[in-house]
Amino acid sequence: MGKKGVYAGVKADFRYGDESVTRLINTIMSDGKKSVAAKIVYEAMDIIDAKVEDADALEVFRKALGNVAPLVEVRSKRVGGATYQIPMEVKPSRREALAFRWIKQFATRRGGRGMAEKLAAELLDAANEQGASVKKRDEVHRMADANKAFAHFRF
């Protein structure tokens, strides 16, 4: 009989009341420094608010997240000596996790002053269907499309 509790999930952040923002903060966080990660994310949101007049930062953030999250991905499966790349549908939780990971990865690589500015620029580009994170999503979709022939190999 297990004594583990039920996973409570993430709490909504205090500024926007949104769980997705908390997940982004957790993704940005390194070495357990959550307050630093929160400061970076909120600063990026403030930059977005200043740059975009017609929409608030949370709308831009949600649009960016939707544009980066992949619908399908390829997974490797070994069938008789050959390894096939099989296109699979992505679960919603993994979609969001991949989107956050890619946004962080490409924001870090960007040129700019600080991480907050880089993150704001990447989110704005993603919301406008541009930027490296959206290209990554398109690349993953192209890979899945190219390997449609192996879709009958299911896990």
UniProtKB/Swiss-Prot annotation:
It comes from the Bacteria. CDD domains: uS7_Bacteria. InterPro entries: Ribosomal_uS7, Ribosomal_uS7_bac/org-type, Ribosomal_uS7_dom, Ribosomal_uS7_dom_sf. GO terms for cellular component: small ribosomal subunit. It holds the Pfam family Ribosomal_S7. GO terms for molecular function: rRNA binding; structural constituent of ribosome; tRNA binding. One of its GO terms (biological process) is translation. Keywords: Ribonucleoprotein, Ribosomal protein, RNA-binding, rRNA-binding, tRNA-binding. One of the primary rRNA binding proteins, it binds directly to 16S rRNA where it nucleates assembly of the head domain of the 30S subunit. Is located at the subunit interface close to the decoding center, probably blocks exit of the E-site tRNA. HAMAP family: Ribosomal_uS7_B. Part of the 30S ribosomal subunit. Contacts proteins S9 and S11. Belongs to the universal ribosomal protein uS7 family. This is Small ribosomal subunit protein uS7. The gene is rpsG.
